[in-house]
UniProtKB/Swiss-Prot annotation:
Entry's family note: Belongs to the IFIT family.
Record-linked InterPro entries: TPR-like_helical_dom_sf, TPR_rpt
Function: IFN-induced antiviral protein which inhibits expression of viral messenger RNAs lacking 2'-O-methylation of the 5' cap. The ribose 2'-O-methylation would provide a molecular signature to distinguish between self and non-self mRNAs by the host during viral infection. Viruses evolved several ways to evade this restriction system such as encoding their own 2'-O-methylase for their mRNAs or by stealing host cap containing the 2'-O-methylation (cap snatching mechanism). Binds AU-rich viral RNAs, with or without 5' triphosphorylation, RNA-binding is required for antiviral activity.
PANTHER family (UniProt xref): INTERFERON-INDUCED PROTEIN WITH TETRATRICOPEPTIDE REPEATS (PTHR10271), INTERFERON-INDUCED PROTEIN WITH TETRATRICOPEPTIDE REPEATS 2 (PTHR10271:SF4)
Gene name per UniProt: IFIT2
Originating species: Cricetulus griseus
GO biological process entries: apoptotic process; defense response to virus; innate immune response; positive regulation of apoptotic process; response to virus
Primary residence: cytoplasm
Name this polypeptide is given: Interferon-induced protein with tetratricopeptide repeats 2
Positions of post-translational N-acetylserine modification: S2
Gene3D superfamilies for the chain: Tetratricopeptide repeat domain
Subunit and interaction comment: Domain-swapped homodimer. Component of an interferon-dependent multiprotein complex, at least composed of IFIT1, IFIT2 and IFIT3. Interacts with IFIT1 and IFIT3. Interacts with STING1/MITA and disrupts its interaction with MAVS or TBK1. Interacts with EIF3E and EIF3C.
Length: 468
């Protein structure tokens, strides 16, 4: 095939609606991070999306250079589409065929790539378009793919399902996708009223256990009993569905039934024995029980506390051993070892935590915890000061930064009261004074920028907008 023909083929491939053209990976996201997010971290595993998952896995396999495995996943996707959508096989297969074409193109098997392009064209030409058509099924498939693969495209996900619903407003699958996207939009980027859409999805498809748990999570603040009924109903309907078990565990944790939450996650762990995030959350729930005992100073619970502490450490260590990508597992482990008075192990996990690529907020928290460890347990004030200073140098306003600033000021004032010429105390105070000046200056610059860019709202928009 000539170079000109190859370029023509690539031009046609770019017109396809499939995982190779949807830009599902964030720009700074590694393939390991993408795969981990989709197949481990994200709890959503809708039964009706088996073909979607095979297509995503095929995309990942291709990116890893495992094209033979990618083709096998695409074969599975075709089989699931045949089973789950026998009346819409051609339309539903357009995405899978597009993925086939891309994989064969990258393998250099251009004739096979063209053959799958021809299959797509034959379907699309029925709708007067060569390689791309507007179809609710395709909008739905794109919506599911983006729902699984992205975290910052919730508005776009919602638009996909809304477009599908415009053409088929009574479709239960489209309504479920729309409701789930509304639920996610309730957290980021803006507040939505997800309750009504979740209720609508359940009315249209009563056997939607995952959606029922999402509704329960929305109701738990004010209607806990109704939420609990929905969760237990979902668990009866789908006792072996990991997304139901994991989301139900979140519900019980939020309603302060940590034992039930741990029980549900333990069931999920039997089905997902290599999922670091399930280990991680079980460990976090045990950790929460330990901290609750400590905060109440329940000395009668000392024996129970010791067992809970061991469990928390065990599960968080398993999470760290299974997947080192979880950012704050080392910080939690170090803190737990401090509580267990195992200081060598605590220091090991503090050091390991600093080697991870942490967000500014998590790094500040780690500096605070390590500083406290040096100050209170190791009785090494100089090392504690070093950690607090490193933490407050990070340019992000957080609660840990405020705590470290206060600790530094307290240490400096105490040292200066004992020796007015203490060089370290004077250095700390000078540093904090300079830091305060920088913060005030940055705040003024930010305020001036906001004044100059402040939009002028029309009365109708202002009056009808969401008040938050």
């Amino acid at each position: 095939m000539s170079t000109t023909t190859k370029k023509s083929l690539e031009s046609k491939l770019q017109q396809l609606k499939c995982h190779f053209t949807w830009n599902l990976m964030a720009g700074d996201e590694s393939l390991d991070e993408f795969e981990d997010k989709v197949f481990n971290k994200d709890e959503f595993q809708k039964r009706e999306c088996k073909a979607t998952m095979c297509n995503i896995l095929a995309f990942v396999k291709h990116r890893r250079g495992q094209n033979a495995s990618a083709l096998k996943e695409l074969e599975k996707a075709e089989q699931f589409i045949q089973q789950q959508h026998p009346d819409h096989v051609e339309i539903r297969n357009i995405v899978t065929w597009g993925n086939y074409a891309w994989v064969y193109y990258h393998m250099g098997q251009l004739e096979k790539a063209q053959a799958y392009l021809d299959k797509v064209r034959q379907v699309c030409e029925k709708f007067s378009s060569p390689y791309r058509i507007e179809s609710p099924e395709l909008d739905c498939e794109e919506g599911w793919a983006r729902l699984k693969c992205t975290r910052n495209q919730n508005e776009r996900v919602k638009v996909c399902f809304e477009k599908a619903l415009e053409k088929d407003p009574k479709n239960p699958e489209f309504t479920s996708g729309w409701a789930i996207s509304n639920y996610r939009l309730d957290f980021w980027p803006a507040q939505q009223n997800a309750v009504d859409s979740l209720k609508q999805a359940i009315r249209m498809s009563p056997n939607s256990p995952y959606v029922k748990v999402l509704l329960a999570l929305k109701l738990e603040m004010n209607q806990e009993n109704q939420g609990k009924e929905l969760v237990e109903e979902a668990l009866r309907e789908a006792p072996g569905e990991t997304d139901v078990l994991r989301s139900a565990a979140r519900f019980y944790y939020k309603t302060h039934d940590k034992d039930r939450a741990i029980q549900l996650l333990s069931q999920a762990l039997e089905l997902l024995p290599n999922n670091a995030y399930v280990y991680y959350y079980i460990g976090c729930f045990y950790r929460s029980k330990v901290l609750q005992i400590d905060s109440r100073r329940e000395t009668s619970q000392n024996e129970n506390r010791e067992q809970l502490l061991k469990q928390a450490i065990y599960y968080l260590k398993k999470a760290e051993e299974t997947k080192e990508m979880i950012k704050d597992s080392c910080s939690y482990l170090a803190h737990l070892y401090v509580l267990a008075e195992q200081y060598k192990e605590a220091d090991y996990y503090f050091q390991k935590g600093f080697k991870k690529e942490l967000t500014p907020g998590l790094k500040q928290l780690l500096h605070l915890r390590y500083g406290n460890f040096q100050f209170f347990q190791m009785k090494c004030e100089d090392k504690a000061i070093h950690q607090y200073l490193e933490g407050v140098k990070i340019r992000q306003k957080t609660k840990p930064k405020e705590k470290m600033t206060n600790k530094l000021r307290f240490i400096a004032e105490r040292r200066r009261s004992q020796n007015g010429f203490d060089s370290k105390a004077l250095h700390i105070l000078a540093f904090l004074q300079e830091l305060n000046k920088e913060s005030q200056q940055a705040a003024k610059v930010s305020e001036r920028g906001q004044d100059s860019e402040r939009p002028v709202f029309s009365p109708s928009l202002h009056e009808g907008g969401n008040e938050q």
